[in-house]
Amino acid sequence: TLLLNNALFELYSFLRSSDKIGACGGNLYDEDNKPTTSFSRKYPSFFWELLSIMYISPISLSHPRSIFFNVSNKPIRVASIVGADLMVRKSVLSQVGAFAPEFFMNYEETELCHRIHKAKFDIYSVPLAKITHLEGRASYIKQSRLYFLYEGQYIYFRKVYGIFGCRLIFAITQLKSYIRILQFLLLGSPERRSYWKMKLETNRKVWNSEKIKRILK
């Protein structure tokens, strides 16, 4: 992570501007200085996952130019900030707690932001803070990273929606993979079909892991 300007000062100043602000983050750019995912406008849910199966994203309809990046040149309220530039008020951390130790790589900032919102604090995207996030932008997620992505997803849904919610999101995720495998078989795209088969197998492997079995008890 590299600072493109006085980003820390911009975030710190904004955080101190109101006691109602619990956390904030800036705009992230990739290594080619192109905008990349900086925040999320909604929290993960069964509804959004089901819509994604049909390639439907209501957020992209309401915010076609700024789904995950702030192009407004002014602070906007969001659901969660990417962990690479998440700044949280110390008193808020004392109240809601820090990152949950169950997470390894993914969803830990999402779950923390969810707790911050439940405590009645706002979270903002501050575009004046500009930061380079040195992370790969490959179209296909590597299997090793995908494993921890699924693991984080199940831990998040277990914490937020309970055991039933965790089982339901597994079923939806598997359904999506089966549909994509059939879709790309019919479209004659063996590479994409193999990728989704890998996702299906990785998801099943995560679900059957000892860590996930423990959180389902």
Give residue ranges: language-model regions:
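Generic structural signal for small/hydrophobic residues in well-ordered secondary structure
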Residues: C24-G26, N33, R89, I116, ...
